[in-house]
Amino acid sequence: MSFSVAVAGASGYAGGELLRLLADHPRLEVQTLTAFQNAGERLREVHPHLTSYADRTFVETTAEQLAGHDVVFLALPHGKSGAITAELDDQTLVVDCGADHRLVDEAAWDAFYGGDFAGAWPYGLPELLHAEEGGTQRTRLSGVKRIAVPGCNVTAITLGLQPGIRAGVIEPEDVVAVLAVGPSGAGRSLRTNLLASEILGSASAYAVGGTHRHTPEIRQNLETAGGGHVSVSFTPVLVPMARGILATATARLAPGFSAHDVRAAWELAYADEPFVHLLPEGTFPNVSDVTGSNTALVGLAIDEAAGRVVTVTAIDNLVKGTAGAAIQSANIALGLPEAMGLPVNGVAP
């Protein structure tokens, strides 16, 4: 049995990545592709690399075009999902790759996004640890009909730090994360600061001082993992790589814990995870190791002189950071094998 699929916003980077992954999924069948500005165009004109869809045509993004499918993936700008979703059947599985339904706290939404607050949906990070109820988020995704996919930066920081927060081996009040990110995370819209002539041979920090919209979501996740207040300083740095995130996150080592205790916390958290892997001691990931895959690689160290735990996490922002997470969560919701249709291995060189 196959499930019929519509992808809204299929002309963008996230939408295109959804199509690439879904092309090899044995149980999810793409029937409808929607777009805004590209409606009426052939897919080959927008995504020439997706030859299996070359002759398909984008249609307008309306609730009418999306209705009647078993699964709808939304790859739309924030603020665009709520109105469309309200018109879709409650029994349709809707997976939103945008920010509209990630935050639980309405005040945080108002402060960082603004506009109408659409409310939180079940959160699409299966590996997210839960301190109070125990277990992981995957048990809370089974059978749901609405899923909010995490932000890509949020995923990288959460996967890097949550085992330590959960085990209490790091101080939650002193978390610092600096992320090297590629421009594809900002979408496909033309912007001067994302032009090749602006970013090649350079690097630039942005949203400095806790102003990035992913900040409250990072805090929300780490507080879910630890059960208490978390203070996090997050700074992204735009670097000249098309895709990928390398997240270097540090936190103060909690009193009374050893290097062995720290490593044991990460080993316990990820021992059975299909897509998150703790690297051997002294080994740290490159972004190229995970390109094209739904895998997250985590390196771990202790800065003895500074008394801090350091994690380095690499993900592909378009796969594990967006489209792969969407499909992984949809698989769970539909009762399919979690890893079905998702690449584990990266592409090299």
UniProtKB/Swiss-Prot annotation:
<keyword id="KW-0963">Cytoplasm</keyword>
<protein>
    <recommendedName>
        <fullName>N-acetyl-gamma-glutamyl-phosphate reductase</fullName>
        <ecNumber>1.2.1.38</ecNumber>
    </recommendedName>
</protein>
<dbReference type="GO" id="GO:0003942">
    <property type="term" value="F:N-acetyl-gamma-glutamyl-phosphate reductase activity"/>
</dbReference>
<feature type="active site">
    <location>
        <position position="152"/>
    </location>
</feature>
<dbReference type="InterPro" id="IPR036291">
    <property type="entry name" value="NAD(P)-bd_dom_sf"/>
</dbReference>
<keyword id="KW-0521">NADP</keyword>
<dbReference type="InterPro" id="IPR023013">
    <property type="entry name" value="AGPR_AS"/>
</dbReference>
<dbReference type="GO" id="GO:0051287">
    <property type="term" value="F:NAD binding"/>
</dbReference>
<dbReference type="InterPro" id="IPR000706">
    <property type="entry name" value="AGPR_type-1"/>
</dbReference>
<dbReference type="GO" id="GO:0005737">
    <property type="term" value="C:cytoplasm"/>
</dbReference>
<comment type="function">
    <text>Catalyzes the NADPH-dependent reduction of N-acetyl-5-glutamyl phosphate to yield N-acetyl-L-glutamate 5-semialdehyde.</text>
</comment>
<dbReference type="Pfam" id="PF01118">
    <property type="entry name" value="Semialdhyde_dh"/>
</dbReference>
<keyword id="KW-0560">Oxidoreductase</keyword>
<comment type="similarity">
    <text>Belongs to the NAGSA dehydrogenase family. Type 1 subfamily.</text>
</comment>
<dbReference type="GO" id="GO:0070401">
    <property type="term" value="F:NADP+ binding"/>
</dbReference>
<dbReference type="InterPro" id="IPR050085">
    <property type="entry name" value="NAGSA_dehydrogenase"/>
</dbReference>
<dbReference type="InterPro" id="IPR000534">
    <property type="entry name" value="Semialdehyde_DH_NAD-bd"/>
</dbReference>
<keyword id="KW-0055">Arginine biosynthesis</keyword>
<comment type="pathway">
    <text>Amino-acid biosynthesis; L-arginine biosynthesis; N(2)-acetyl-L-ornithine from L-glutamate: step 3/4.</text>
</comment>
<dbReference type="GO" id="GO:0006526">
    <property type="term" value="P:L-arginine biosynthetic process"/>
</dbReference>
<dbReference type="Pfam" id="PF22698">
    <property type="entry name" value="Semialdhyde_dhC_1"/>
</dbReference>
<keyword id="KW-0028">Amino-acid biosynthesis</keyword>
